[in-house]
Amino acid sequence: MAEPGIDKLFGMVDSKYRLTVVVAKRAQQLLRHGFKNTVLEPEERPKMQTLEGLFDDPNAVTWAMKELLTGRLVFGENLVPEDRLQKEMERLYPVEREE
């Protein structure tokens, strides 16, 4: 089943390939930082119904697509280099290392 808003997402990019790359990179960032770096407000977060109740959906791709739909993420050329951005993200949202 297609995600709601997929047509709007396709309209935001010049190709399906670019959309795939943008969503995948954002999903990777969300997973790396435990979703602490999301731009979604609590009431906007994707939900999943389980037998125990309604919980945040653990699917990072769904979160990334929903974030793009809000228009609060910037993607494209001439942005901060990815390595510099990664260092800043690690400073803001430290990754807990398993020992």
Curated annotation (Swiss-Prot):
Enzyme class: transferase
Catalytic activity: RNA(n) + a ribonucleoside 5'-triphosphate = RNA(n+1) + diphosphate
Disulphide connectivity of cysteines: none
GO BP annotations, alphabetical order: DNA-templated transcription
UniProt keyword Cytoplasm present: no
Documented EC number(s): 2.7.7.6
GO cellular component: DNA-directed RNA polymerase complex
Record key words, sorted: DNA-directed RNA polymerase, Nucleotidyltransferase, Transcription, Transferase
Pfam families: RNA_pol_Rpb6 (PF01192)
GO MF, any single term: DNA-directed RNA polymerase activity
Function as written in the Swiss-Prot or TrEMBL entry: Promotes RNA polymerase assembly. Latches the N- and C-terminal regions of the beta' subunit thereby facilitating its interaction with the beta and alpha subunits.
Quaternary state and interactors: The RNAP catalytic core consists of 2 alpha, 1 beta, 1 beta' and 1 omega subunit. When a sigma factor is associated with the core the holoenzyme is formed, which can initiate transcription.
UniProt similarity note: Belongs to the RNA polymerase subunit omega family.
Descriptive protein name: DNA-directed RNA polymerase subunit omega
Species classification: Bacteria, Thermotogati, Deinococcota, Deinococci, Thermales
